[in-house]
């Protein structure tokens, strides 16, 4: 059986460019097909309704992943409404602001994965250009991968695929991705590596708070520019910490790797020169 996964991307969080690739990292899985559509950087109601309706009515996958910022915002709320009314199992992947809507999403029959270390960008025109945007997102992706947060997401989606393949009832995830869940999924062997990853996670959480202050709570340009710049410096440092954590694991040949087999089976290895099983 080939499970058809539909991914809707509206706006952008760090997990957005990663989600479809993390499910088929070598592009050789025979048990899934992934179709991604999106509305680019915008996530207004009109853009979101257009792409979500297309996914539900035209593409009709076995299950849907909606990924983007703040699932409680007006645009994503429209997507939730459409997905809830459909008979297609759906999961919302979002950032920390979505936590306030998690009970509502559960009432709507939707799964959710809300990632606390996937922070808002410093979206001030005087500071943010395409280069800065790209570098920020690159740092966020390193934090998601290096702390284990991305693996939490991957495991939850793989669970859905396996349930569909087996013909079992789908249990949609209801997960708030915390530092504890992330580092547990990362399976660090070195306690110092784990500590560095926890520190990186905490820093990424604070980046979101600082960028909210700089983007929405501060009106004077001479004040908000250094505020958002400081947040970007912080995520850069967090990315360096996860690099340091991985180097510690590499030094003892104990990096946890969990590739997918061609049949979609989740494999496992730690030693560099051994085969995954």
UniProtKB/Swiss-Prot annotation:
Entry keyword annotation includes Oxidoreductase: yes
A single BP term in Gene Ontology: one-carbon metabolic process
A Pfam family per the record: MTD
Keywords annotated in UniProt: Methanogenesis, One-carbon metabolism, Oxidoreductase
Superkingdom in the source lineage: Archaea
Its EC number(s): 1.5.98.1
Pathway(s) where this gene product acts: One-carbon metabolism; methanogenesis from CO(2); 5,10-methylene-5,6,7,8-tetrahydromethanopterin from 5,10-methenyl-5,6,7,8-tetrahydromethanopterin (coenzyme F420 route): step 1/1
Cystine residue pairs: none
Signal peptide: none
Keyword 4Fe-4S among record annotations: no
Catalysed reaction equations from the record: 5,10-methylenetetrahydromethanopterin + oxidized coenzyme F420-(gamma-L-Glu)(n) + 2 H(+) = 5,10-methenyl-5,6,7,8-tetrahydromethanopterin + reduced coenzyme F420-(gamma-L-Glu)(n)
A GO term for molecular function: methylenetetrahydromethanopterin dehydrogenase activity
InterPro entries listed in its UniProt record: MTD (IPR002844), MTD_sf (IPR036080)
Region: Disordered, residue numbers: 249-277
Entry's family note: Belongs to the MTD family.
Function of the molecule: Catalyzes the reversible reduction of methenyl-H(4)MPT(+) to methylene-H(4)MPT.
Protein name: F420-dependent methylenetetrahydromethanopterin dehydrogenase
Annotated source species: Methanococcus aeolicus (strain ATCC BAA-1280 / DSM 17508 / OCM 812 / Nankai-3)
